[in-house]
Amino acid sequence: MKKMIYATIYTMDRDHPTAEAMGIEEDHIFFTGTREEARAIEVDESLAYPNQVILPGFIDTHVHVIPSGLFMTGADLSQAEDLAEVLELLRAKAAETPEGKWVIGAFFQDKHIKEKRFPNRYELDSVSTKHPIFICHNDLHPFSFNSEALALLGFDPALDGVCTDENGELTGCIVDPACVDSLERIYAFFSDEDLLKGCEAVDQMAAASGVTTIFGKDSIRVLKLREQNKERFCAEFKPMWMTYNTKDWEGLREILEDEALREKTCICTFADGAFDGWSASVIEPYEGRPTEFGMLLNTDEELYEFAKAARAHDLQFSTHAIGDHAIEQVIRVYERVLKENPKEDHRFRIEHFELPTKQSVKKAAELGIALGMQPLLIEICEGMDLSGYACFIGDRAGKCSPYRSILDAGILVGGGTDFPVTPMRPLHGARICMTQPTASERITLMECLEMNTCNAAKLGFLEDRKGMLRPGMDADFIVLDQNPFAVPVEALSDIKVEQTYARGKLVYARA
């Protein structure tokens, strides 16, 4: 069936940036051009959007699908002002949760409550001793558990990052590097169907946000479930295997032996943690903590061996690196791997790249390293007044997220959210990038949109099908109630997604 759609269309194709009409046949685009040209084409149906604007479907290059799905059913702690309110919100959630089932507290930032800390196991025990209880920091790094959860998970008190009191008893708080496998331990208590329902919740939210392609950063179990049940979902899924263990050769073998995953999976690991929790690895010490520099989760050699193995099998590789010291390590390792086994268009990635030095930006550009960055980290974590990071890294907060410098260096950047760390709101993210506190690092609306469409597609080797509206591409597009190029910057956040189409199928319509 052929459809012709008439609207103001921004194609994100620099050779043909706008169109007045777009032809859809089944799941792909067969025409873009003028109204006059379109009227000469015989179609089965015509749709007109005289007051709306059409863009390619957004692409989110960094989503933690399963924690997101589970957290969406948990207690939202983002607005809590003190520990008493945190515990009360958890009690309300426990009251509606069957005994023995997990109670999850999500979107928590200890720096935002009066006490500036996580609740300990005994405070969480006051909520319930008949439910395992788990609180996760908004950035997915520090955690806190009650006694029931600790008993189920079996943390070794000797493990670095498992917090104990003066008597050697677990406090319930888990920090890097011990938290690295905590989520995996928790997932084991959820059935496949539980996890798939979490995937569906994220998928539905993505459609409502205009996101038609998700790069899912999850465990092999989750990647396989998502691939085996892809007919249940609207968004296309680009698998990214996330592992903190750079010696997980069994996991790598499992990816290589799965035909579907072998062809499209990006291998992802971690160089450091996050500023919240003081675990991002920095060159200069943390503010007010002259002996603390964060941590590198792997040695150069460990990271090198893992990246080398991925390159040997022609797999894309990605490393989380937030602090300037961690970023330097990753660039150093990538340079070694790519020198030994060159590939012109490797698209090795660094995730976040929040506090790079000028030299790191220059070197990343020289090596052809691509970046997965999340604009809303500026608002949610750094703070529009920089206070969110200034408490950890002082004046260096003003050097975070240097988008202008990165794009001017010619580096490929794909936008994302790190959901659930930040919400799926691409147009709000554009506003934040255009108004960020470091004025010299602001970028244009077109650059913001490219990060979430054509450049995001290229980040995942999907540019032959995704990210632009032109003949031969997938019919992934969204209908907006206002033209983002015709409203004030501050109004970008208020633009609504009216409809979302994925591969030609209407998957969301605003009520």
List PLM regions with ranges:
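Non-cysteine beta-strand/loop elements that form the S-adenosyl-L-methionine
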Residues: 64, 264-279, 369-379
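His/Asp/Glu-enriched, well-ordered alpha-helical/loop segment
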Residues: 308-317, 325-348, 353, 373-485, ...
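Short peripheral tails and domain-boundary helices/loops at the edges of structured domains
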Residues: 497-511
